[in-house]
From Swiss-Prot:
It comes from Alkaliphilus oremlandii (strain OhILAs) (Clostridium oremlandii (strain OhILAs)). Gene3D superfamilies: 2.40.50.580, 3.40.1350.60. It comes from the Bacteria. GO terms for molecular function: DNA binding. InterPro entries: SfsA (IPR005224), SfsA_C (IPR040452), SfsA_N (IPR041465). This is Sugar fermentation stimulation protein homolog. The gene is sfsA. Pfam families: SfsA (PF03749), SfsA_N (PF17746). Belongs to the SfsA family. HAMAP family: SfsA.
Length: 235
């Protein structure tokens, strides 16, 4: 996923989930935050951030959208739409080794009472396999270990359990955690934050759902799905 034009700024404060105050070229601006999660460990007053410049769109309420933040020397993308886009591109370009011989890939497909991020079809040795992928973006990191979620997510738990049902019905089910940074070498479930979600993922992994974690290469104007990262399911 590539951004058209990106500028730098200094984060000042976040009045609510949707907007932030950022200093850009010496002027304080109200900007859109492309992530409604808490991100408290990232959005600390004074940190450097990157913003997508949207001034060429006259219909926008704000001129900029906050997309990335530096945590020390590590650049973390926090755009909640980016993991889905990066995964879609990587799968389409056959860069995800777990999904090969792709014949069809589609976004936002309904199954049961849920809408999964991606639907795909593969053809191996004449056998057609249909499947769903649910993508979760990961921004919470501590000492090289990433965790999800950073806030309770009933909706996320529902998606995971629906994926188990899809597998029971013969579909291939994949839960893909996209770590929106490069560097961490382990992904863990955040049992302390959301035990129900963590239990659901553990249950899913034991009942046919493929749980994957990939890091990402983060450039100032781009996010590219990277390498597979080990998963620790333990509480």
């Amino acid at each position: 996923m590539k951004y058209k034009k990106v500028v730098e700024g200094i984060f000042l404060k976040r009045p609510n989930r949707f907007i932030a105050q950022v200093l850009i070229d010496g002027q304080e601006e109200t900007v859109h935050v492309k992530n409604t999660g808490r991100c408290r460990e990232l959005l600390i007053p004074g940190v450097k951030v990157l913003l997508e410049d949207g001034r060429d769109n006259p219909n926008r309420k704000t001129k900029y959208s906050l997309i990335s933040v530096w945590k020390g020397d590590m650049l973390i993308n926090m755009d909640s739409q980016a993991p889905n886009a990066a995964a879609f591109t990587a799968i389409k370009e056959n860069r995800v080794k777990e999904i090969q011989s792709l014949t069809h890939l589609k976004r936002e497909v309904t199954f049961g009472k849920s809408r999964f991020d991606l639907y795909f079809e593969t053809l191996n040795n004449g056998t057609l396999q249909k499947g769903f992928i649910e993508v979760k973006g990961v921004t919470l990191e501590n000492e090289g270990i990433c965790m999800f979620p950073d806030a309770p997510t009933e909706r996320g738990t529902k998606h995971v359990l629906e994926m188990v049902e899809a597998v029971k019905q013969g579909y291939r089910g994949i839960l893909l955690f996209v770590i929106q940074m490069k560097g961490p070498n382990l992904f863990k479930l955040n049992w302390e934050m959301d035990r129900a979600f963590s239990q659901a993922v553990q249950f899913a992994s034991e009942n046919g759902v493929e749980v994957l974690a990939y890091d990402a290469v983060i450039e100032k104007d781009e996010i590219i799905l990277g390498d597979r990262v080990d998963i620790d399911y333990r509480a």
